[in-house]
Amino acid sequence: MSENTKNMNTKITDTKNESNITTNTNATNTANTTNAASVAKAGTAAASKSTAGEKISGRLIGSIVAVGSLAFIGILTETVMTVLFPALMREFNVTTSTVQWITTIYLLSVAATMPVSSFLKRRFKIKALFLAAVALALIGSLIMIVAHVFPLLLIARVIQGIGSGIATPLMINIILEQSPRSKIGRLMGVGSLVITVAPAIGPTVGGAVTSILPWRAIFVIAIPLILLAAVIGCRCLEQKVPTEDAYLEPLQLTAIVFALVGLVLALNQGGVAVGKLVSGANATASFIITAVCLVVGLGSLALFAFMSRRAFSPLLRLGILRDPVVLLHAVAYTLMPLVAIGYGYVITNVAQLSLGTSTFVAGALVLPGALIGAVCAPLGGWFYDRFGAVKPILIPMGIAVLGPTLMLVFSMRLTAAMLAGFYFVFGFFYAIGNANVMTSALSEVPGVFKPDGNAIFNTCLQFGGAAGTALFATILSVAQAGEGKEGSASFAHATAVGGAWTFGTMILICVIGWTCLATAMRIRVRRSGRAVR
């Protein structure tokens, strides 16, 4: 055989071998790809099956109910006292702007305690915090029962506010830490339900109880409920995350307390000053107090932010607010509850002081809207789990503005039925949307910082409530200034005018809050490069 023929045969053989190798390699790659796809499908199916099989333990439900009950009782007594304002004004001989401190100082105490909740969670066991909240709730209730001077009532409300300030974020932290991941939206809705049922029944309970018993009986009834919550909590609470040697910086705590109190005092005293100016009295001192409180509040807030940035162990890790999505959610979570909590105050007082209804009827007017809101909070959580954040938040929050808008349109010819109906519209849509705002924001926060996010958002919620009550009470007081005594026709008309002013203010605040949420969603879309549900 010639050399050329041998070379040709060798090339043919090599070509065949290469072909076989290529074929085998392709077959192997195809098989590997198929196997990888099968493994991926199997993994996805297993993950789906695992997620679907996640269950909520009875002890977790018991823990949520026990801790949430303390927050429930605190909010219940807050809304009960709101409907009793006219009676308290007569008993203790105080004005509208003074009696509102029964609610405002409670909310301020809650708000001042919230920033400490992240430290408390890291430093102390869950059961110890729970029992401390129980003790504070009991002590506050006992003082309310025996108090016969107005300052003592305020002291009791401070004690109760601190107890609720421990209990509310503790419940949220338990849900975030111990819930199955696929059930967080629903359980956050349940947490909202525990808290929002209180405003639903608070004014009605207040009106019903005081129609047959002294108002102090409300706190007598609260004591066995607190003890029942204590029993459930002691049996169900579990410590899933170990404690650590966290450090509390006293100057940071002092700064945030001064900031919150200073800002609300500035709002309150500003209203007093305007009221005196309208009635022709000397308002110089009140304006000076307003300016001092505003400077102290803003200065303390700036100092707190400065110390938090430089501290090794900050009271609150404010760095999470550098994310514009989280920041805008926090602003909205301050503004919308400001409207919601103030709304109940305005309705009950307009009903009594303008329409002349009884305490019981005034409290009952809030019941339908608050009850439907309480029922819809878990529904909002289900929508979040099913559809994501955008639609379950923006659509209902936008429609909720219809409630105060109708109030404003009919403000000078409102009836009791209109007050109840328009509040029902607001309560229904607000509850569905607002139940998901904190959940949506915390989805952007790393796990290790979620307790800080929880504390920040709960502080925003309570500060918004305190500011809302003070703001709307101030607006009503300004409208009532110089218009005669309670019960006169001029006073009733002035209260209706003040109600119209508050409803207009509510609309503006709702629009700003909704705009913040819509902007946050757009930023999230741009950042992710895809549509966010």
PLM region descriptions:
Residues 181-183, 447-449, 487:
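Transmembrane-helix boundary and interhelical linker motifs in polytopic inner-membrane proteins
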Residues 212-332:
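Hydrophobic transmembrane-helix bundles of small-molecule transporters
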